From Swiss-Prot:
This is Aspartate/glutamate leucyltransferase. Its EC number is 2.3.2.29. It comes from the Bacteria. GO terms for cellular component: cytoplasm. Functions in the N-end rule pathway of protein degradation where it conjugates Leu from its aminoacyl-tRNA to the N-termini of proteins containing an N-terminal aspartate or glutamate. One of its GO terms (molecular function) is leucyl-tRNA--protein transferase activity. It comes from Cupriavidus pinatubonensis (strain JMP 134 / LMG 1197) (Cupriavidus necator (strain JMP 134)). NCBIfam families: PRK01305.1-1 (NF002341), PRK01305.1-3 (NF002342), PRK01305.2-3 (NF002346). Its main location: cytoplasm.
Amino acid sequence: MSKLKELPLSALQFYATAPYACSYLDGRMARSQVATPAHLINADVYSRLVRAGFRRSGIFTYRPYCDECHACTPCRVLVEQFEPDRSQRRAWRRHGHLQALVAPLTYVEEHYSLYLLYQSMRHAGGGMDQDSRDQYEQFLLQSRVNSRLVEFREPPGSPEAGKLRMVSMIDVLDDGLSSVYTFYDPLERNASYGTYNILWQIRQTRELGLPHLYLGYWIAESRKMAYKARFRPLQVLTGNQWQAFEDDGVSAATAAPPDEPGPVQE
């Protein structure tokens, strides 16, 4: 019998969900293509799926599979060529003092409290601000791949030493890091925690000697997702090919629908 790590992508099955309300674009319906069974999706297989445009939520591995909309475009940063712009350099200077601790996925009550505060202030009414502990754990702390939790705190000796500012979940792939989810202190109005987190992940990807930081989906029409285009050079996946992001050349209107999982042209 083949070992799990040797099983090919063809051992998986893919099915489409029923339509549901899109969480990114108001008034639209969405569908997802789901990869199963979950126990066959180890770190190696998941790396290939991410290159084909998939993401995960807990042990649920999926990608957009909508009937008429192709607004969700997978994107990744070429970390060796990345140069921060002026506002990104300011964010790094503002938050570079934070102390980062990388750990396995673990439940911490302090993290959960910050998550609820973040959801209540940044995504009120979206449903996630009412997540129970079980829902939080299923969403962020369950994984069958190589995942890490990173917490960012004020350093010793600072006025608010030890204060939790941000928590980020990342997956380690064979060709980079994948940014899973991030939540942070929403009471700091002049902070740029989200930008700093991506800059930190870019630096970590470089230090690991890996070429890509996967940022999930870029959605031109979604204010929550459009910020990803600021991290250049950026590549986007259209059909089965990764290509350079161009403001006028790749958009929600031109992005191709996903093909069946298969070889991806790098």
